[in-house]
Amino acid sequence: MPRLQQKWLNSRECPTLRGEAAKGLFPTKDDPSAHKRMSPSDKDILILCCKLGIALLCLGLLGEVAVRARRALTLDSFNSSSVQDYNLNDSENSTFLLRQGPQPTSSYKPHQPCPSEIEIRMLAKNYIFTNKTNPIGRLLVTMLRNESLPFSTIFTQIQRLEMGIENRKRHSTSVEEQVQGLRASGLEVKRGKRSALVKIGDRWWQPGTYRGPYIYRPTDAPLPYTGRYDLNFDRWVTVNGYKVLYRSLSFRERLARARPPWCMLTQEEKNDMKQQVHDYIYLGTGMSSIWGKIFHTKERTVAALIEHYSAKTYGMSYYD
């Protein structure tokens, strides 16, 4: 006896043809295609694939959450050497910030992030703890969230920010003091309305605003909407005299440069476009009558002439 029948006989309910037909497994007189219905259709396979995809997505999300939780847990497990590097061990809040427990005596060490990451996080904690609204702290936090920038880049950003903060602090000094201090450095300086101005190249700059050489004047700049392509085949435009790659513009700026707006057209072109629209609406010219222009008959030509002259006579022009 085959194993399947043996299993059926040993089970409590012995399957009969009538019972299987009731389930829809065998064809009957009433339902001859019952056995075909049980084979999975394309729709069933699609639904199954969708369910599998959703399950995999959920697994991936769970894994991401677990990784982030582990990172957050290992964040505070810094060794004492990194504390001494930043001279935070003498501050009263360093133990509170680091929450250092007893170090493991065995040679086994748990996973620790790379030193640059430790340094960044230490800096971020230090800056944020001193002042919640500190722009450097906020910058560090955003960069940590990005998790893609090297430490050197972040350090240059911090230096720039610190320079900007110093410039803001110096702004409180009078213009005369600024002029005297800058003259001592041997630069060409003049007094401006709000601050001293330094001459770099052929332009006057406020202190802290010079961003490198001012490349393009409005005369030799490329067209502001179409732009040009440089030697690297990158499309670029000028923004306030600086070369800016098209791909680095914001979406709104790119959208604004997608086509020339009305202000790029001359007044004659604007009038011509308006007249074309007017003719299309009131005289029925345009693409609709293109077959009449190609295969024109005598009657159609006479009718068009009469229509045209009557429109001229009765002042149907857009500007009359």
Curated annotation (Swiss-Prot):
Residues 66-319 are extracellular. It is a single-pass type II membrane protein. The chain crosses the membrane at residues 45-65. Keywords: Glycoprotein, Membrane, Signal-anchor, Superantigen, Transmembrane, Transmembrane helix. Residues 1-44 are cytoplasmic. Glycans are attached at N79, N89, N93, N131, N146. Pfam families: MMTV_SAg. It is found in: Membrane. GO terms for cellular component: membrane. It comes from the Viruses. Superantigen. Belongs to the mouse mammary tumor virus PR73 superantigen family. This protein is coded in the long terminal repeat (LTR). This is Protein PR73.
